[in-house]
């Protein structure tokens, strides 16, 4: 009974006396290092010409186990290309599993490193423009083209 107590105290003293073994990070001032496989908020990707990659097939919504994605497609009459007229992501319901990313045939949905999602209820539902703005901001692009 006394030996585990001594082991615990020795570990505590060793950590206390050696300043190089500090595990605490100054989070708000210094962003944490995220693993390469980290899954954060899904973002809609943009093609080189500035148009969205999504073809509104709805596979991401079907693959989502938490039903947090809503897609309604429409067709562009000039190019005969489908696009999402409505694309909504409910960040409160999302479990960041990555199934939407795996299901997308054109790689339009990618889980990025956005993890600071504390927000009010009104702003937790991301529509198409909010998701595209996240990608534009990351790539340094201006508003819609």
Where are these regions (language model features)?
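Non-ligating segments of multi-cofactor redox enzymes
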Residues: 1-82, 88, 92-93, 102, ...
């Amino acid at each position: 009974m006394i030996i585990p107590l001594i082991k615990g105290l020795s570990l505590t003293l060793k950590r206390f006396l050696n300043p190089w073994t500090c595990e605490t990070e100054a989070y708000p001032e210094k962003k944490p290092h995220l693993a390469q496989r980290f899954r954060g908020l899904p973002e809609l990707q943009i093609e080189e010409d500035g148009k969205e990659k999504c073809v509104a097939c709805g596979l991401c919504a079907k693959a989502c186990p938490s039903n947090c994605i809503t897609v309604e497609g429409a067709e562009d009459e000039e190019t005969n290309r489908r696009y999402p007229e409505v694309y909504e992501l409910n960040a409160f319901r999302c479990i960041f599993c990555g199934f939407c990313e795996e299901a997308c045939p054109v790689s339009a949905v990618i889980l990025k490193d956005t993890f600071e999602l504390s927000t009010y209820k009104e702003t937790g539902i991301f529509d198409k423009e909010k998701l595209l703005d996240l990608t534009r901001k990351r790539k340094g692009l201006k508003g819609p083209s």
